[in-house]
């Protein structure tokens, strides 16, 4: 599944769909809850950008973690290959996540845009960021095949119901018409089983494998997935 962000540049959007087809992706998930960036105070405090901007603070961090510096300077220059031919901010210019969302993504995206993207893609199509019954019903109306009940990891607003809190109502309303995925807050095997017991067809998450990736690379991700699998199997037996 390819997580899709809807850009202002329609040519870029079309190109990304074409590349997904060439790469034989099974599905596209259109992200609908980040047409602008949330006020991510941690990023503001740390000065986080992608790629990293070298500052006195970051240089000190690199000095204290020499392997970071070795990896950064010994590998290919960071770039977002799908964006580099369209926008300079997509290549190697340091930009914050909030600035990227606000300046690059189409804040006027609506249901018609989502429906057109689904038609162009022509395959399994998910809307990521659905948190209400009314939006879930609309997703069914435009022909989506699945929805992710998600608040983007709680990173967009300072307060929100959790996806799990919304799950039962949404499943009751549309669960017989569309696949419902619980996204966010999934840390343990019991979390997966609780979501499935309410009616979710699947669960997804980010932090549980991204932290492992940052700490130990591919082997870390493999270990995190194995831990989750082991917990689910153990919890089902218990």
Name these PLM-found stretches.
Residues 1-141, 153-156:
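Active-site entrance/lid segments in N-terminal catalytic domains of soluble metabolic enzymes
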């Amino acid at each position: 599944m390819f997580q899709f962000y809807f850009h202002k540049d329609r040519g870029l959007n079309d190109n990304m769909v074409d590349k997904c087809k060439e790469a034989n992706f099974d599905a596209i998930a259109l992200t609908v809850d980040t047409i602008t960036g949330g006020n991510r105070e941690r990023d503001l405090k740390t000065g986080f950008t992608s790629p990293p901007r070298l500052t006195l603070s970051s240089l000190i961090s690199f000095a204290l973690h020499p392997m970071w510096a070795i990896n950064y300077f010994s590998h290919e220059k960071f770039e977002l290959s799908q964006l580099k031919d369209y926008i300079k901010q997509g290549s190697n210019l340091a930009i914050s996540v909030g600035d990227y969302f606000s300046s690059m993504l189409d804040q006027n995206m609506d249901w018609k845009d989502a429906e057109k993207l689904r038609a162009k893609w022509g395959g399994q199509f998910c809307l990521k960021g659905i948190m209400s019954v009314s939006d879930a019903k609309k997703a069914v109306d435009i022909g989506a095949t699945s929805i992710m009940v998600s608040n983007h990891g709680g990173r967009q607003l300072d307060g929100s119901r959790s996806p799990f809190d919304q799950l039962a109502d949404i499943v009751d309303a549309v669960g017989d018409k569309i696949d419902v995925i619980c996204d966010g807050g999934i840390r343990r095997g019991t979390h997966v089983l609780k979501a499935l017991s309410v009616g979710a067809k699947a669960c997804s998450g980010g932090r549980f494998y991204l932290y492992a990736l940052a700490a130990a690379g591919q082997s870390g991700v493999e270990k995190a997935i194995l831990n989750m699998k082991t917990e689910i199997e153990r919890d089902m037996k218990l």
